């Protein structure tokens, strides 16, 4: 069986290519203990571009993709953010990306293995059709069951199901760690029971939140914190002007403040952050992908006592002085993943959100004519929108809605 799509390969000149691809359909399992199931056919309808795709393309250019290919293959169909049509079930679905011989793909441990459609060991969604484990084709909210055409506004919202699920998990982890980290402080301060102290700590963990970097990841983490902690003080930090559309949107939707650091030194950045939030941060989320974030948090002391540093960036190396790190009781953690429950929650939230407002489209014909050029000059350029997506199969789309 063949399909048309874009795929990664190890090639200095063509790490990403559009063309005919042989489809494979090995049995896959969703979770440890479950039966491996042969995939059922699905047609990708609306696809989103993710920074992971761009990084995989760079790996292909450097010849480093062998570990990512499906077994026995020398290419990987890319894409892991999509709304698909499942003809055998006559419905739209969101593909749960992560599965495998794992009790919980979020708590991946050494004795477990997992795959990710479009990223690691399993072909993805930038193709005319593919096969997916039927247990991993998640339903849209009940009010949308029975749709035969996908409204454009809904498609734009649901294309964020993967990254927003990450944000749901990020909030959950910060809350878990924050309660464990801070309940004894609250207990000593308030002379209350352990259970009461836990609830106080659940909120005080998010008293002063710094989100260093304003892309979709930072935006969604901020949104999750605001939805769960109405009194949290949230500050986005970035280099974009406060007058840009994305900054205005983030401030309005998340009810957050913003600091533009374009002309500031690191020391000035730290000073202004502390001034803006009224003290040192209780949570510092690094999502800028730069080394500046950890220096601002640790060297310049933006992260306060008992503070949590959430590293969501891929690439930077975190360094810190062990003396203040130890005496100020800091915690550093990183957890870039999610489970089915997180994605199902994300789908429900997104369907009623305004996040369709930050998605812009690239024409499919323009993209497939030269996908590398599109990635480098349209989708991930400095002038790129917060999110780019493509209508992959217009036959299942309602473009007027």
What residue ranges belong to the model's regions?
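Short N-terminal strand-loop motif that marks the start
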Residues: 1-78, 186, 190, 201, ...
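Glycine-rich beta-strand-centered segment in the early N-terminal region that forms part
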Residues: 29-48, 60-107, 123-124, 136, ...
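C-terminal hydrophobic helical "lid"/dimerization subdomain
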Residues: 38, 178, 264, 268-272, ...
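NAD(P)H dinucleotide-binding glycine-rich loop of Rossmann-like/cofactor-binding domains
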Residues: 80, 99-208
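Glycine-rich cofactor phosphate-binding loops and adjacent beta1-alpha1 units
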Residues: 179-212, 226-232, 244-331
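Hydrophobic/small residue at the entry helix of a nucleotide-binding pocket
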Residues: 216-217, 242
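Residues in the short beta-alpha loop(s) of Rossmann-like NAD(P)-binding domains
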Residues: 238-243, 315, 338
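Rossmann-fold dehydrogenase core element
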Residues: 307-312, 320-360
């Amino acid at each position: 069986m063949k399909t048309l799509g874009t795929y990664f390969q190890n090639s200095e000149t063509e790490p990403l290519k559009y063309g005919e691809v042989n489809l494979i359909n090995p049995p896959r399992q969703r979770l440890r203990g479950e039966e491996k199931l042969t995939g059922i056919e699905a047609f990708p309808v609306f696809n989103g571009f993710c920074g992971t795709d761009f990084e995989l393309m760079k790996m292909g250019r450097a010849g480093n993709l062998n570990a990512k290919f499906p077994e026995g293959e020398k290419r990987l169909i890319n894409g892991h953010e999509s709304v698909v049509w499942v003809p055998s079930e006559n419905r739209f679905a969101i593909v749960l990306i992560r599965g495998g011989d794992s009790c919980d793909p979020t708590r991946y441990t050494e004795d477990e293995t997992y795959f990710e459609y479009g990223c690691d060991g399993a072909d993805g969604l930038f193709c005319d059709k593919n096969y997916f484990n039927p247990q991993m084709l998640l339903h849209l909210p009940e009010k949308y069951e029975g749709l035969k055409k996908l409204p454009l506004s809904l498609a734009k919202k649901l294309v964020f199901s993967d990254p927003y699920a990450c944000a749901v998990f990020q909030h959950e982890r910060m809350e878990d760690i924050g309660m464990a980290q801070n309940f004894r402080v609250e207990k000593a301060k308030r002379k209350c029971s352990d259970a009461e102290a836990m609830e106080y700590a659940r909120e005080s963990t998010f008293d002063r939140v710094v989100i260093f970097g304003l892309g979709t990841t930072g935006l969604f983490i901020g949104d999750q914190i605001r939805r769960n902690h109405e009194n949290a003080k949230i500050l986005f930090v970035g280099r974009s002007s406060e007058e840009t559309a994305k900054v205005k949107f983030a401030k309005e939707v998340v009810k957050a403040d913003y600091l533009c650091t374009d002309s500031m030194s690191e020391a000035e950045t730290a000073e202004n952050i502390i001034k803006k939030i009224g003290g040192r941060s209780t949570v510092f989320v690094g999502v800028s992908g730069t080394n500046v974030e950890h220096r601002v948090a640790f060297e310049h002391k933006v992260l306060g006592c008992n503070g949590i540093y959430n590293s969501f960036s891929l690439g930077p190396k975190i360094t810190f002085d062990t003396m203040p790190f130890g005496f100020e009781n800091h915690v550093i953690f990183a957890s870039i993943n999610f489970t089915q429950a997180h994605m199902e929650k994300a789908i429900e939230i997104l369907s009623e959100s305004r996040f369709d407002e930050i998605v812009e489209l690239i024409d499919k014909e323009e993209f497939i004519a030269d996908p590398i050029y599109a990635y480098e000059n349209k989708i991930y350029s400095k002038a790129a929108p917060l999110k780019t997506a493509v209508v992959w199969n217009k036959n299942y789309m309602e473009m007027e809605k």
